[in-house]
């Protein structure tokens, strides 16, 4: 939990959406609104130009909602892989899909009050029976978890 909420472990992922239930339920829409920033700040953006905020921007607010003596009743976080990383995965895996065919690669994190579950997901803009992208994404996530010393089954 510390690697998710306190450390920078997931900071390069984009946030699609999140919700957390403590004394109330809080919903977070991960869509990024660059018009909120000053011109100088907006010019420094790269990854977030794809329409979603980086987890590193939202993590402090999410963490603030978890602080206190009580554990959250539940939370759900949906991360998306940044488009340039999707492209890199496609190239590295030798898949025939183009980045335009991929709507998103997702990491769903669900906490039910006692256990944390991570599930991968893919969304394509085209129909395909090929499961190569799903296998490549799962493999990439396994390597990521291993590298970050996050236990998984």
Predicted segments, located by residue:
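Generic alpha-helix detector with strongest preference for long hydrophobic helices that associate
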Residues: 4, 13, 17, 58, ...
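General N-terminal targeting signals
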Residues: 27, 32, 37-40, 45, ...
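Surface-exposed, low-hydrophobicity interaction/linker segments
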Residues: 49-115
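Mixed-charge, glycine-accented linear interaction segment located at domain edges/termini
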Residues: 116-153
